Amino acid sequence: MAKKSKIAKNEQRKEVVARFAERRNELKAIIKNPNTSDEDRLDAQFELNRQPRDASPVRVRNRDSRDGRPRGFLRKFGVSRVRMREMAHRGELPGVRKSSW
């Protein structure tokens, strides 16, 4: 089980990312557009740099939805590899079963 503070911090980061996502995308589009003037591009870069560090989506960590484990995360199931194995053995994941050949 991950520390409650780490899980809470990650949830807070998700909220900050969602709050700044639209403006962040607008600024990045201005910066990438080749027809933008140098002055506008520079202003957009400055505004992007003034945004909070946690507004960047790369700072959000994928965590197990059950216990917050940060490693071994499987996107398809939204849980860690350990939890996925336990759930599969209990038959809680439809269509998933232990393979044998």
Curated annotation (Swiss-Prot):
- What Gene3D superfamilies does this protein map onto? 1.10.287.1480
Which residues does the annotated region (Disordered) include? 46-72
* Record carries keyword Ribosomal protein: yes
Q: What are its GO biological-process terms? A: translation
Annotated Gene Ontology cellular component terms: small ribosomal subunit
Q: Which of UniProt's keywords are assigned here? A: Ribonucleoprotein, Ribosomal protein, RNA-binding, rRNA-binding
- Cite the Pfam families for this sequence: Ribosomal_S14
Indicate, by first and last residue, each region the UniProt record lists as having compositional bias (Basic and acidic residues). 61-70
- Record-linked InterPro entries: Ribosomal_uS14, Ribosomal_uS14_bac/plastid
Q: What Gene Ontology molecular-function terms does this entry list?
A: rRNA binding; structural constituent of ribosome
Q: Indicate whether S-adenosyl-L-methionine appears among the record's keywords.
A: no
Q: Which NCBIfam families does this one have?
A: PRK08881.1
In the record, the note on similarity to other proteins reads: Belongs to the universal ribosomal protein uS14 family.
Q: What does this protein do?
A: Binds 16S rRNA, required for the assembly of 30S particles and may also be responsible for determining the conformation of the 16S rRNA at the A site.
Its quaternary organisation is: Part of the 30S ribosomal subunit. Contacts proteins S3 and S10.
Q: What is this protein's name?
A: Small ribosomal subunit protein uS14
